[in-house]
Amino acid sequence: MLLGKDVDEVLERHLDIGGNLFKGIRHAGSWDSSNMINNSHHNPPKDMYLMKEFGEGLKILSGKGLVFEAWQYHHQLLQVAHLASNNPDLIIVLDHFSGPLGIGSYATIKEQVYKNWKKDLKELSQYKNVFAKLGGLAMPINGLGFEANPNPPT
């Protein structure tokens, strides 16, 4: 999406190759200033979802009827609300319920994290073009400690 308007050519190529099997893209924007918390695999810039080029790319994606999967941390939820507000025809899937962090500096303020997460999820829920994917809430970044158990939590 950071290609802005130039993403059209890339999406067209995907549509040509994938046909009706190509439904959309996931562009992970999870970013935190702490060196104890990993950013997304491609190390996105801070506030990537608010960048002009990203918004231009989403307009192209939306115009093609494709889906956008958003993966970011809890403190970035309102950036997704910004995307939803500016792209009412774009279907947005909120991956991993926006990863509430529970490690690093967040480990000692979990109650505040969950309070803010709940408030921001409620704000986001007003947008009928946003859907949430339930999963990924037992990752080590959530700080629940499931990774220390001998067996998975489910």
Short names for language-model regions:
Residues H27-M48:
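Glycine-rich phosphate-binding "P-loop"
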Residues M1, K23-S30, L66-F68:
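Divalent metal-dependent hydrolysis catalytic cores, especially in the metallo-beta-lactamase
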Residues K5-D8, D32-M36, L78-Q79:
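Short, well-ordered, mixed-charge alpha-helical segments that flank or form enzyme active sites
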Residues D16:
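Gly/Ser-rich oxyanion-binding loop with an adjacent helix/lid
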Residues N43-T154:
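Catalytic pocket-lining loop regions of alpha/beta-barrel enzymes
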Residues M1-R13:
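A metal-dependent hydrolase metal-coordination microenvironment
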